[in-house]
């Protein structure tokens, strides 16, 4: 896992993240990737200096609402998703948040299974879990 480097997103990351999204999903949702929006937090995972995935979230009360976790198809199975979740959860804990909620489609069985292995339970629009209190 040590070759995956995660960092906070920067304003200049938008084009590269949109390319990743287009590669994985066909059409990029340009509104979903806004590292320059002060209401969003974006974490970028890199492998060998290239973007391998990202997570986009926002705080809603005591909940970190994760709108998207995306890993490039070529980089799946290389612990990119685990590292992004580690960063999301650490961000939530460091801000005293109580829960993480991740949007994931019901039909996306591989993602739901991945989150279940990480302790997330199904909820109305995705999965969620409580954060530890430090």
Task: Report the location of each language-model feature.
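Acetyl-CoA-dependent GNAT
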Residues: 2-4, 8-67, 72, 85-86, ...
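C-terminal "cap" of GNAT-fold acetyltransferases
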Residues: 2-3, 42-43, 98-134
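Conserved acetyl-CoA-binding loop-helix of GNAT-fold acetyltransferases
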Residues: 71, 77-90, 113-117
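Short acidic/polar micro-motifs centered on Gly/Asp/Asn
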Residues: 89, 93, 102-104
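Short coil/turn segments at alpha/beta junctions that flank glycine-rich nucleotide-binding fingerprints
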Residues: 78, 95-98
